[in-house]
């Protein structure tokens, strides 16, 4: 069916007209005049931290997800607890979030270059893009202009989707943040550079159900390997666990290939193969890395726009409100 140029432009303007004001407020060139070196400063900080600690990319990407999923992308995950309030970073799902120092370091440098200009929320969003790119993944232009939140509550971290969710629960959780089924499967691909402690998946390895000792959706040999990494002994190291795909330092589509082989570490990951709503997406990305990269960049922009505040502050210190 052919469309005239006039009709196409009309359709584009119609779409732009329904964009939420909070999303429209963001701009890829937001700091071009006020802090032109902002992205360079953040990139150099992230790159140096990654050279020192290869775990930084996975940690900062996870930080971005956990920040955006609570009150939107507002850097509330960075705030410290006080005597009267337990903050997000001390909520159970966030106890294992690490590498806050990287964001703090970037923010200190930005305050010297451009005082009270670049928000902590934008630093997290840009850093998340940078760690993906530095790990071999896609690049995208980060929309900027977020404001930093002043509220951070540990009890709200219960809204983060746990690794035990089934597909219906995952779909509902992501939909509450304006994300589609495809966005959910795509963003789950961030686990390609992830690591998990045993506590997040060991329920799949033993006494799984009344009828199965091991989760039947898991590759048996893979389950035995994980059992060795997570022995049920009193002297098991507190950091015992496993990477979430076999090329954990590289951002690629191996995560999806492993799901096809029954080697998804989390129950929520492997469940994506058992549901017709998500199976085709897993299969597509396992076969086409370029498609995964393209969709991941788009979904990250979409997640980064969630809950953006039109009013707020540009925090001077990442850990405290002004």
UniProtKB/Swiss-Prot annotation:
It catalyses: 2 a phenolic donor + H2O2 = 2 a phenolic radical donor + 2 H2O. Coiled coil: none annotated. One of its GO terms (molecular function) is lactoperoxidase activity. The gene is PER66. The keyword Signal applies. The keyword Disulfide bond applies. It is found in: Secreted. Residues 1-24 form the signal peptide. This is Peroxidase 66. Belongs to the peroxidase family. Classical plant (class III) peroxidase subfamily. Disulfide bonds join 35-114, 68-73, 198-230. Its main location: secreted. One of its GO terms (biological process) is response to oxidative stress.
